[in-house]
């Protein structure tokens, strides 16, 4: 009606949520007044139809299912359901529920979600599976299409490799620093 679509992205909203929570921690450290409780996400907001793009459910995309866990939103039953829907044993996390490919950025972000939701053993298992795809240079491909047994897409994206590093740090505490996703 006003020229704007009434759509919101769960992934973007969760990223903003994490940023606001981090800002609040910084503000407290600096002695500044800050309260974003009214605009922060919760399970009720996540279940809103505003996240169904143009009336089409986004539940088939793994990111739209696990990003709320990065914010600490959800419960063990919901994360188990997400794991059941998107986890491919021995390979990692599918990007899209009906497609035969896993991506290692999605796998890594889901690993972080599992650690955040106190499912560290599941996180460790999936990370070990992802590690099998590291090439002889120490680099991870973006994804793997398991029906065709090919790397797909045929690229080695920086964000994928960054996500694997962050996931490994969440699981093993390699940096020995506090992780913003786990705070």
List PLM regions with ranges.
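Alpha-helical positions within canonical tetratricopeptide repeat
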Residues: 34-35, 121-125
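Generic hydrophobic alpha-helical segments
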Residues: 23-24, 75, 117, 171
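Alpha-solenoid helical repeat scaffolds
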Residues: 26-29, 120, 133, 174
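Extended glycan-interaction surfaces of carbohydrate-active proteins
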Residues: 1-8, 38-104, 125-183
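The feature captures the catalytic groove of carbohydrate-active enzymes
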Residues: 1-39, 115, 153, 179
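Residue at a conserved register position within TPR or TPR-like alpha-solenoid repeats
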Residues: 20, 27, 69-72, 111-114, ...
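Internal helical hairpin/lid segments
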Residues: 97-118
